[in-house]
Amino acid sequence: MAVVIFLCCLLGGIAIGLPIAWSLLLCGAALMAYLDMFDVQIMAQTLVNGADSFSLLAIPFFVLAGEIMNAGGLSKRIVDLPMKLVGHKPGGLGYVGVIAAMIMASLSGSAVADTAAVAALLVPMMRSANYPINRSVGLIASGGIIAPIIPPSIPFIIFGVSSGLSISKLFMAGIAPGIMMGAALMLTWWWQAGRLNLPSQLKATPREIWQSLVSGIWALFLPVIIIGGFRSGLFTPTEAGAVAAFYALFVAVVIYRELTFSSLYHVLVNAAKTTSVVMFLVAAAQVSAWLITIAELPMMVSDLLQPLVDSPRLLFIVIMISIMVVGMVMDLTPTVLILTPVLLPLVKEANIAPIYFGVMFIINCSIGLITPPVGNVLNVISGVAKLKFDDAVRGVFPYVVVLMSLLVLFIFIPELIITPLKWIN
């Protein structure tokens, strides 16, 4: 009965237009009433406790770093370097989009921010060069969802807080699959570029490449500082967020001199708005997650899937299919916060590596960001590119097939994720 109440309130809230955070609070209130423990004070305290975590402090800092990058010229220079290196290839702007998305992923950790920044710079150029715009938009959207995989990743931070797993290990485990996803997308684009006879840009001279490298080196040095810092133990992933924000601010104001103090105000306001949305969503989801645990839903799911525990791979396939279905209709953050406490005990009981499960969870949910009917990243890039949502769906379809095929490969060959993690550690 608790499951029915939760789903009805969640889907009903979304259907009448409530934001997902308020829908989750509605679920929490309904579950408290069903469990005969409704108390506004307890609900408010649980809501506050949901956001009261030192690890979550990394989120506003990484959001701020991303805003500074966009306003301070770092994003522009990150796109310019791969443009000079591979832009002259047939369909070169597509390769630039994926490479830039991967570099941006190592700086912002947000799929929506990554996609919006790259699309704003490249889509007009692709349109001017007569690229098929729906395929181009699909490629950039697919590249944008690498952001939650390559560190620093806001979803990994949220998963780490929700599961109690090491955020540093989750960060390290995301590097290899993130690179593989980028390589798979570029290989797919190479095949399409050959069939579509896409035009190429003028080849940059060695001098232009050198100037672009010198100009962009300050921006490219940021992921080295972040990953190297917490990998060496110099600072924690949470402290890495503060370091990233300070470094981005220093480069934007002192080195590039493109961020003025008047524009800094707007950057801070935008970062505060984005952070408030994310943190309120996290807090609201924690209320529902707490009540789900009290209602013993994890135990019910465990009992339901108990016969599959002796077949870990079959169990994992069922779990991945379940996450995929939920990820297609719900945003990444609430999916992580709601399903993690339900599925993680079962994963541990089946002796599936929790870090591997965490990486697969986020990859699966990330693909959901570019699949209908919701597709948050598709909605964002459709707005930026002034393209109909249906056209964006058709454009992204071949890349979704490739990424899902890669997900299946990761399921049957977990060593593709686990072995590189051992090398890195």
Descriptions of predicted regions:
Residues M1-N425:
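Alpha-helical transmembrane segments of multi-pass membrane transport proteins
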